[in-house]
Amino acid sequence: MKKSLFAALFGAFLFCGMLSAGETPAISIFGDSYSTFEGSIPQGNAIWYFNPPKNNNDVTKVEQTWWHQAIALLGGRLEKNESYSGSTICNTGYNKKDFSKISFLARQGRLGKPDMILICGATNDSWAGAPIGEYKYSNWTAQDLYSFRPALAKLFSDLKQNYPGAEIYFILNSQLSAAINESVHTVCTHYNIPCIDLKN
């Protein structure tokens, strides 16, 4: 994970001029494997970054995670880290399994009382080959939410409704499918949610 790049992007791009001096924003992290760290996410959520490490990755302590560095640069505090390794935004997971209990949609109500929400998702939707679906911004059916586009729209709608005072940002990983990239940009624009595209 591009930890230094993430931190630089957040420091330069997100919070500049947003807060008054002395404010400490409550920041919630909403993600998948790249946003996990053992001891920092709810018990029972699947973990990718363990303490001590198990997966031969280069993250060995929480201070190395992108989100910890970002929060530090923003002068904030962690409100909640609701991240779950392998989770998809929509309710379709790997091998077409039903992920409706662990998807971003299922977990969006667990973010506490944040001033800012940083969402890092869609990677597993791309890698799992989840159905893309059609753009739909209201009247979602249960079946709609097994496809990426309507699920992302429903997710943003729920977040806006449940956290009306929070600034919301979406971080889009690099090397995802063109359909996922296009979908994220389109739905972010519809809901006026800034999207930060990672490179390389």
PLM feature spans:
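Conserved SGNH/GDSL esterase-like catalytic core that processes O-acyl groups on lipids
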Residues: 26-28, 37-137, 141, 178
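Bacterial N-terminal signal peptides
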Residues: 7-17
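Short hydrophobic segments within beta-strands
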Residues: 30-31, 171
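Alpha-helical cap/lid subdomain in secreted, periplasmic
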Residues: 99-200
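Positively charged n-region of N-terminal signal peptides that target proteins for export
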Residues: 1-5
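Boundary at the C-terminal end of the N-terminal hydrophobic targeting segment
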Residues: 19-23
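Active-site glycine-rich loops that stabilize anionic/oxyanionic intermediates
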Residues: 34
